[in-house]
């Protein structure tokens, strides 16, 4: 729905707070925003599940910004004082003032492309003037070619710091010379900016966009950033994020639990330790050599001993001294030796079926402390490593290409991760509240929530430290002074387990309904095929009867589903194995002429998700092109893969979502085995006040979270519709709360045959919607192809670029999907005729109703036998009342202009003309009471709530067809003039006659 911020609707949530929303919100949006306002008032946290397509992002932005605006108005003097402090003001402001000014909003999402969409949504609202910035790495922002040509992000950072310290970056120097007022003048556009906007402004003004965005974050009211910038202690430290008195929003938070655990985990190899030792030796040798050269220089320049002394440290990087390097080198040597001893000791136990050994996390802390690195010394340890890396890179012309500081970087990151997770204040936060504080501050308390795992590969050790408590990361945020944490997603279910594991103080847990009371989704659990029950176990992948039944089920659904079908498998290996069997196995009798795979390819254009990310754009393009073809397309993909998240499949692209099997995590994966071991250990502990989650429940929850995320592809907005097919009998025994609340009432069980019948009936009832979506999808594809051509033409300047290098984020990002602004055509004012019961007056006979241009039907085949074939085109002309059209083969030269047929009252079929003359007062005569109620509700909805004409068409179709098609056609008189022509054209297309 396109909205104009100037025409926003004021929504009162309670007696104190109103929200300016771009349009009249649906009930589910009101409920969502009320929950946000309530927890902000109470200074509590929230877990908010709302189905995809219900305006979750818009509701989050409008409600939080409205609440902050109200607070700002109540403290105008404090806010004005803070804002006038200028760049760096957040650091200079006294704590007392800091506590009194408005909270900063941190809006986090998984990827930068998702954040681009947040910017797009924000600019639809009246809150677009709020001072906003977006944070990202140099990889996204930097415009200095010396840095851009470097691929590794860590090296980019070190090279950038070196250029900045030497004043060798023109873009940074110009940024550094900017006054605060000038910077604000450059960046103030009257609306929020995404990364592309920052880079464009930076390039135009030769000013570093990376540092501009970071500086703006010091005084911004809304900061957009990826998850890990908030969760990862190293990133918080790097970007100097001040979380005190802030509101932190995690959008798309369904994966947040695993992300929190991952960011509190760490990995290091003995190879990295050995490389770190070699790099430290190299730095030490270079440093000693430089000191010797400095002494010789001093001896040559000074006649009297001691009369002129050179401060050697000023010739080197600040604080980098040979004695520090030698002490550090000794500690790393000891660490390498202690890890070898630990692996051979009985402190680690074997963990079948894994090859390595494991123990509680406390063993790692003990090993690090015995190596001279504990919580008190780690800061200095890491600082020396960082200085050594910068020094090594500053000598890059003198060192080999392999000596880039990667080993030192790995050791530094490992230590920071461990001790950021195990700082004493964190231990105090995550300890049980019923235990005395003195007993909670020991970092070993935190280590009980972690597992150390070491394995040996080809004689080299791999040390992994797994954190299995997401609450550690969340409570670390609260310890930093975060005021509220809001977790939102379309799929948080099963939500009770999710909220338990996050460990926050939830004031609201919402499982929201869909915007539509009757969700236009058909969900079928297929329990049986021709040969029996469908159980997608690992063993059944080799069972030819099971694989055949799954293949037959897919074919039947593909045959009865129009447009696009998404098929999700549990894993790449499952998908590959089943496809391989389908390609070899004949369908039906042994003498059947075609295999399962051949039949699928005849039914739909098939695309398969690749393992390599760089190949995904081409596969995505093949699928979208296939969807617009007569038989449609099917995309085979995997749960938790690149397709199941992060890509928006709208309307025609996801008429059916099929899930084959249940996507349980790999049972022999190291993290899975150790997580289950950790949960089993918790079940045996008697010192816990709350009953922990069992390993069985966690394992099932992980699977269904992936299922629900894939299911979310089927509905993307209020006018969307589709089917969900779950091919596995085990879904039938799942508890209802494992599925999203909005889906539960749509689920039924059936066998393969009945599933196909129900699917066919479902889409037959929505035939007119499907026809309309075809033309809409073609328009969308035209814009997408134009965007794709623009991206391709931009890359053509570099002969090394290839189409496979263009990512999905390039092709389908909000930036590339922007539509050129067209001249706005004001609709004719609507006149109300008091003599009639019509809501809108009938347009005059001179109002011409334009029929769509029929585009050239281009042959999609790429192999053309001769050039003359290229000139043979077919054109379709349509006359009023005959929607089938006639094919006319042209000569060798196509027409220069496309023909346009205009539809007027005079050119309509006679019966249509008669129907349009029926007074609107006749529409409800003889109508049943129920139909009258539905009719009135439809008119009110159309007039008051921006109901789409397609929905009006569908509702009126149910009332008047097949009994009174003349009244159905006459109903077009109650529509706005711009919708009336579409209504009549749809009626002609469906051959509604009498």
From Swiss-Prot:
It is found in: Nucleus. It holds the Pfam family ARCH_RTEL1. InterPro entries: ATP-dep_Helicase_C, DinG/Rad3-like, Helic_SF1/SF2_ATP-bd_DinG/Rad3, Helicase-like_DEXD_c2, P-loop_NTPase, RAD3-like_helicase_DEAD, Rad3/Chl1-like, RTEL1. [4Fe-4S] cluster binds at residues 142, 160, 169, 208. It is an enzyme of class 5 (isomerase). GO terms for biological process: DNA recombination; DNA repair; DNA replication; negative regulation of DNA recombination; negative regulation of t-circle formation; regulation of double-strand break repair via homologous recombination; telomeric loop disassembly. GO terms for molecular function: 4 iron, 4 sulfur cluster binding; ATP binding; ATP hydrolysis activity; DNA binding; DNA helicase activity; DNA polymerase binding; metal ion binding. Residues 833-844, 859-869, 880-889 have a biased composition (Polar residues). Residues 818-896 are annotated as: Disordered. Residues 15-324 form the Helicase ATP-binding domain. Residues 818-831, 847-856 have a biased composition (Basic and acidic residues). It catalyses: ATP + H2O = ADP + phosphate + H(+). It comes from the Eukaryota. PANTHER family: DNA REPAIR DEAD HELICASE RAD3/XP-D SUBFAMILY MEMBER, REGULATOR OF TELOMERE ELONGATION HELICASE 1. A probable ATP-dependent DNA helicase implicated in DNA repair and the maintenance of genomic stability. Acts as an anti-recombinase to counteract toxic recombination and limit crossover during meiosis. Regulates meiotic recombination and crossover homeostasis by physically dissociating strand invasion events and thereby promotes noncrossover repair by meiotic synthesis dependent strand annealing (SDSA) as well as disassembly of D loop recombination intermediates. This is Regulator of telomere elongation helicase 1 homolog. It comes from Caenorhabditis briggsae.
